[in-house]
Swiss-Prot record:
Keywords noted in UniProt: mRNA processing, mRNA splicing, Nucleus, Repeat, RNA-binding
Annotated function: Necessary for the splicing of pre-mRNA.
Record's compositionally biased regions (Basic residues): 144-172
Domain note: N-terminal RS domain has a very strong bias in favor of D over S.
Membership in a protein family: Belongs to the splicing factor SR family.
Protein name: Splicing factor U2af large subunit A
Amino acid sequence: MAEHEEQPYEGNGNGGDPAPASAYAEYPAPEGSPPAAAAKPTGFSDGATDGGRSQHETQPHDGRSSKSRERERERDKDKERDRDRDRDRRDRDRGDKDRDRDRHREHRDRSERREHHDRERSDDRDRRRGHDSERRRDRDRDGHRRHRSRSRSPSKGRDRRSRSRSRSRSSKRVSGFDQGPQAAIPALAAGAAPGQVPVVAPAISGMLPNMFNLTQTPFTPLVIQPQAMTQQATRHARRVYVGGLPPTANEHTVAVYFNQVMAAVGGNTAGPGDAVLNVYINHDKKFAFVEMRSVEEASNAMALDGIMFEGAPVKVRRPTDYNPSLAAALGPSQPNPNLNLAAVGLTPGSAGGLEGPDRIFVGGLPYYFTEAQVRELLESFGPLRGFDLVKDRETGNSKGYAFCVYQDLNVTDIACAALNGIKMGDKTLTVRRANQGASQPRPEQESMLLHVQQQAQMQKLMFQVGGGALPTKVVCLTQVVSPDELRDDEEYEDIVQDMREEGCRYGNLVKVVIPRPDPSGAPVAGVGRVFLEFADVESSTKAKNGMHGRKFANNQVVAVFYPEDKFAEGQYDG
């Protein structure tokens, strides 16, 4: 074993010479590094301290720490920028929401104001309507008594005036008169043009000469537009009323019977086949409506009036909705004169022809008038379909009245207007429809009828006074009111006030006289007439021209001058 001298080991672990003292430098410990542990006593010398870490170990760690801090600062800046952006975004969103909220609040305020305004207007309308309803109820309550008199039971058989107006004199009353007349009556044509209805000149030789000089003034043309030839348009002219049916009648038996009868008399003018299209029966009232296939066949059926059906005579009439003026444009309105009525036991011009709504009653005939004279008077307006002068069975003398039906039903109202009220000797004619109210003048006939009434009234007055009817201060209105209306005190008061208000429109009205029926039933002169006395002729002339032809409670007014001396003496039947 070699002998060596034992030396203490003070190396740096490299097996080399000990490092010089300058090779060690004091580096501060990195921030955050744990404090150096206390030196552990060893057998070595303390040449190596905590400051004796190598330079190679310290420098890289310090560089990484700087970069980490820079990255952290960059991240912090990025986060700050993100926070700023988020804050700006929230501010913008908050601003948008605030603006939306403001807009919504403004819209809601406007809507609330508009709704409030609408509610106020609606409340105002409701209040006004309430006031109007209250006023109407007051008027209805006030007028109840008068309406009661106008709406009496139909069983009394009277046509009541239906003028709804308040009894309260403070409110505006509704007059019984219609609207004011036209400014002037249309000028009359010099000659009868196509479509005009000429006046038939009377040809009463030696009895009433030149009484109706109407040939020089033809009527205003009646313009009738032809309707479309459809089933619905012609239905009113194709229907036939059949009354007085036996209880055993039904739709089938009526249809079969009329088909056979129409074929037997030669009335099927529309060709082969059945003439009846439909039958409707009212078993309670024992009548039927028979619908024919053509207007001409319906007119031919009119000749069957009075025919025997199952042992009972039946009435064949036009229905109430039949309009002769319109039907004239659709086909013949009269039966074919060549019908073979004898084949079914009928004769032309039999008593059956004197039935129906167009039958005329002629009363007030002088007893010494013969049948030929009365017929001559009536036929001055057209040929007659039927005529019957009623005579006493024992003596054979005339009873002073007759019935007739014209072949042309359109002249029915014309003849009534022209003949009614004419003085014949010591008698005054009463000429009207036998079934008064069953058939009123159609609207298409009113202008023609108005002119006829004007001419007739003028001729009647001229005939009565023996010369021209000079204007007077007194105007007489006829066909205005009925005796039944005059019996009721309230109704009478309303009529007087209506006449006074209407008369004052034309000038200085002095007096209104409306004769009333006697409660005991004794005859009173002038009942049904209204007399208006004016201060001057100018006012009375205006009133006559303005009120003539007007409607008062659905009655057509006839206005004429009345003699002042008779009015002053209280003679109201002139």
